[in-house]
Amino acid sequence: MNFYLKTTLFAALALLLTSHAGCKPHAAANRTEAAVSLDTFHLYDQARHRDVPVAVYQTNGKRNRHQKMVLVSHGYGENSGDAYLYYTFLTEFLARQGYFVVSIQHELPTDSLIPMTGIPQVVRRPFWERGADNILFVIKQIKQKYPDRGFEEITLIGHSNGGDMSALFPQKYPGIVDKIITFDNRRMALPRSSRPRVYSLRSSDQTADAGVLPTAEEQALYGMKIVALADMPHNSMCDQATAAQRQEINRHVLAFLQEKKH
């Protein structure tokens, strides 16, 4: 095998291995803690003729009439159909803190797979656009289904490809969400804005494309927070995380959510 072919194959393999979150169902993915209720159901968007499965996590304790909504978008799951259940360590934790948590299944088995070649910002843009449309649809449907909750604040959380679509959302649909928190999105540029507030947790083994992350000057100007985690592989930012990694992610996310508006 010549050098050029070896190099090409290596590059292709590297892209394949780092192109999606790589999360798998965890043993606890189908079990919710006693303090948290889980309700899974399908929403159907008639305008787009699309099924959107969701999982709603709520505390079983006293619920605030003015709950804050958190929408979680999973990393690329190769159309497995259950990737929205790969983040129970986070969704259950936030539900216990009183948040109304909705995890969205963005990929369906009948969807096309995300392209592994080409310029990501071009070939993957339609997938992010669809994800942003899913998020908007779910927000509207949840508000109708739970009219007594108020939902005074809405936050988007997204891992990897889900972070890319979460970063796109406020740029496509401004004025709807209050905060976005991404877990190591690497392709879609984070919005440079003070509303929504922008936060991002960065892995210890992957880098973002040029222009995705704000400069130090932009962070200071807009109040954006980019946190580099020392021992946090990209593929561990889900239920595959160790107990220590889960605790670290939850700690940062809760701090971001509790940060007051300026």
Kindly label every feature range from the protein language model.
Residues 223-262:
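C-terminal catalytic histidine-bearing segment of alpha/beta-hydrolase fold enzymes
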Residues 140-194:
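Primarily recognizes the serine-hydrolase "nucleophile elbow" in alpha/beta-hydrolase
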Residues 20-23:
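N-terminal Sec signal peptide cleavage junction
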Residues 207-214:
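Conserved alpha/beta-hydrolase "acid-adjacent" motif
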Residues 50-149:
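Serine-hydrolase catalytic machinery in alpha/beta-hydrolase-like enzymes
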Residues 25-65:
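N-terminal cap/lid segment of alpha/beta-hydrolase-fold proteins
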Residues 199-202:
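Short beta-strand/loop motif that positions the catalytic acidic residue
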Residues 8-18:
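Bacterial N-terminal signal peptides
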